[in-house]
């Protein structure tokens, strides 16, 4: 077996490049890594244990909470509160933010926003799911309680972001603002190993990912772009391939590696978009830009520039290969 760098070693090496680093962000990533391993274990035995299906409640979005949603949320919350470097958590599964009020946590510099199990409705049919996370420095004074304003920061202020995809293998992909790197979990060793160094999103691709079942509800520009993707034009490699899993992490991960575009636009049923700005759009937009791609909420509207006004704010999302995103926005800008 080829020896490669583990996630822990990679984090330490990266930390050593910054003489003023305190190690707190590294400790935060250790918490995410630990919770990811625990969720990986449960996802992999979902067909054998009584953790599939709905938990009997709704989250703040009005969506049925799946049992694994609740489980993953609790495990990430426990792991992130344990080390005292995070002062608060906002989760798609929580009505409001969660303040960690232990004495060490009050001194914590960071807040974390998380979708603990994206695409969990697919668990029952054995489709890949994932965790999405976003990290910010708190803007309130350390030593005091975390505030709502600590979470309502634009995506440009993210210190780090990433996701874990639980599929045929489990992979953690993250960025701290200097490129994107991916680590594949080796269950025999219990470690994440560097498998995708300096990931780059191709500027062009031949995959478009959109829920075409909602076509009738889409704005005319999106409809025109979908037709453009379906037209035959050999010089440009069209028609493109349609691939839509229904799990943002899985669709984004594929398009990041192979090149492609993911669209979840506004619609007559979701006039503000459906995806959550803070838990889904911002972290994925951060990764896309770090990998050379683009992420827009509309024409000339980068996702990362949006100033949020509420925790569970929704946003449209057009993300992926830069030239494909630009082309989609050409159609959106047509009168």
From Swiss-Prot:
The keyword Ligase does not apply. Pathway: Carbohydrate biosynthesis; gluconeogenesis. Mg(2+) 1 binds at residues 92, 115, 117. GO terms for biological process: fructose 1,6-bisphosphate metabolic process; fructose 6-phosphate metabolic process; fructose metabolic process; gluconeogenesis; sucrose biosynthetic process. Disulfide bonds: none annotated. It is found in: Cytoplasm. GO terms for cellular component: cytosol. It holds the Pfam family FBPase. Binds 2 magnesium ions per subunit. Substrate binds at residues 118-121, 211, 244, 262-264, 274. Its cofactor is Mg(2+). It catalyses: beta-D-fructose 1,6-bisphosphate + H2O = beta-D-fructose 6-phosphate + phosphate. Keywords: Carbohydrate metabolism, Cytoplasm, Hydrolase, Magnesium, Metal-binding. InterPro entries: FBPase_C_dom, FBPase_class-1, FBPase_N, FBPtase, Fructose_bisphosphatase_AS. Its main location: cytoplasm. GO terms for molecular function: fructose 1,6-bisphosphate 1-phosphatase activity; magnesium ion binding. PANTHER family: FRUCTOSE-1,6-BISPHOSPHATASE-RELATED (PTHR11556), SEDOHEPTULOSE-1,7-BISPHOSPHATASE, CHLOROPLASTIC (PTHR11556:SF35). Homotetramer. This is Fructose-1,6-bisphosphatase class 1. The gene is fbp.
């Amino acid at each position: 077996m080829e020896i490669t760098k583990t996630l822990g070693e990679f984090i330490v090496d990266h930390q050593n490049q910054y003489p003023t680093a305190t190690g707190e962000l590294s400790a935060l990533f250790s918490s995410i890594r630990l919770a990811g391993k625990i969720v990986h274990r449960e996802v992999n035995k979902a067909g054998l244990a009584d953790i599939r299906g709905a938990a009997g409640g709704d989250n703040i979005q009005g969506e049925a909470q799946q049992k694994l949603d609740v489980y993953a949320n609790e495990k990430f919350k426990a792991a992130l509160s344990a080390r005292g470097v995070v002062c608060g958590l906002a989760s798609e599964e929580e009505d409001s933010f969660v303040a960690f009020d232990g004495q060490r946590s009050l001194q914590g510099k960071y807040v974390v926003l998380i979708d603990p199990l994206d695409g969990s409705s697919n668990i029952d049919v054995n489709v890949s799911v994932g965790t999405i996370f976003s990290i910010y420095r708190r803007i309130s004074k350390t030593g005091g309680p975390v505030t709502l304003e600590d979470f309502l920061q634009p995506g440009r202020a993210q210190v780090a972001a990433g996701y874990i995809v639980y599929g045929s293998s489990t992979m953690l992909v993250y960025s701290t603002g200097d490129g994107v790197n991916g680590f594949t979990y080796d269950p025999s060793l219990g470690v994440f190993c560097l498998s995708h160094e300096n990931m780059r999103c191709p500027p062009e691709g031949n995959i478009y990912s959109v829920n075409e079942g909602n076509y009738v509800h889409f704005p005319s520009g999106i409809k025109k772009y979908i037709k453009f993707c379906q037209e035959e034009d050999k010089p440009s490699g069209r028609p493109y391939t349609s691939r839509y899993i229904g799990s943002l992490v899985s669709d984004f991960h594929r398009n990041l590696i192979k090149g492609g575009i993911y669209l979840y636009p506004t619609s007559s049923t979701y006039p503000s978009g459906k995806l959550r700005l803070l838990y889904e759009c911002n972290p994925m937009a951060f990764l896309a830009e770090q990998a050379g791609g683009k992420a827009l909420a509309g024409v000339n509207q980068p996702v990362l520039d949006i100033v949020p006004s509420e925790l569970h704010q929704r946003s449209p999302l057009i993300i992926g290969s830069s030239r494909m995103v630009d082309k989609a926005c050409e159609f959106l800008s047509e009168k």
